[in-house]
Amino acid sequence: VTTFHDVTFYNDSKATNTDSVVKALDAFDKPVILLAGGHDKMTPLEDFMNIVKSHTKEVIFMGEAADRFESVAVKMGVQHIHRAQSMKAAVALGYQLAKAGDIVLLSPACSSFDWYSCFEERGEDFKNCVRELEERG
């Protein structure tokens, strides 16, 4: 999406399953703040959360999947777990937690149907929230 204040934002809203998120996380060699959640597909999460634990510095869960994601993440030893009640709040929190060189990645591991009609709409909301944040400086 964009980079400002040396924090890079990536829109991977199309990542609607855990395998896609793992591939996205594997692509980065910098610290990642992961924004995940949405309509819960009720897939097993233990292996996924082990990858999240080793590939992220912070995790922000949102949407209807947030409760289950957080519960499994805690069980699997994931540290630095946060919650957001909206995309705008998730983007703002991701930026607040980031340091220069970090990545804020929207890669939900869920479908979008709890808050949005499709993954494209979710991705557009993410991009708009990032632009708003950038405009505020």
Where are these regions (language model features)?
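C-terminal helical cap/extension that packs against the catalytic core
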Residues: 46-102, 136-137
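Nucleotide phosphate-binding/pyrophosphate-handling subdomain across enzymes
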Residues: 1-56
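Residue-level signal for inorganic ion chemistry
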Residues: 12, 34, 59, 106, ...
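Glycine/aspartate-rich loop-and-adjacent alpha/beta segment that forms the canonical ThDP
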Residues: 109-136
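Short glycine-rich anion-binding loops that position phosphate/pyrophosphate groups of nucleotides
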Residues: 38-41, 65, 103, 109-113
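Phosphate- and divalent-cation-binding pockets in alpha/beta enzyme and binding domains
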Residues: 20, 68-71, 115
